[in-house]
């Protein structure tokens, strides 16, 4: 990110690291420890660890966590799967306008949490990412389509549970998804596929799980737990370096709260095409006179760059590189 580094005081990251895992007897850790963790905070907790199968130590561990989930508003995670499944719990979503499903990322199934845990939680959200062509994660889908059901991302679910809203609204036009709205929260603009750009310039307060259980950092609104132990969790490449699942969701959640994550508006392609046509027509009219065509080309490039930064400041992301390239070739 080219933005200056900022510090987020609303989100605390808790790392389940090698030392903690060794101290509790190995991985996967007993589920009851997650129950102890979420009891230690007054914030909204979220756990990005997948727990699809019963605890190896017995069902008592699962029930210990489920009992705490019943008492404490907590968000759990699940991930998209290439294998068809029966799906999982999903929050009701009101579709305003066109059907959003043809525009959304679609998966055959999901790897869900153990039902006793998912049913006891206040929300379940996806931690699935969609890398760009260069392998880096820059944009994250806020909603995906699995079996014609709409599932929110983990960060969006954290925000919904934090605001106490029961559902979402997804606004779709003929050109794709335009925005997602939590009723008591400002509208979140997205690209046509319900993705938002994520900024990577945010520093979060973080603790190891061992230190957190002894004395948690106070003052956070959200606490997100994730595994960082080498050989257990694999970080995902991003423009800000490799990030673990809870780090990615924290950056996404920060952007949703701050409202500073730029999005590609649904009218972007139309606007870029219209500008390209206008510039080409101007260059065509002045093509026989370099004293006119050169200043027009340079002025157009300057205006495009200025316009891009202007709209970036408004939260819109426009890609004018193609327009400039076409004008240069002309």
Predicted segments with their positions:
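Intrinsically disordered, low-complexity regions enriched in Ser/Pro/Gly/Gln/His and often acidic
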Residues: 96, 190-193, 302
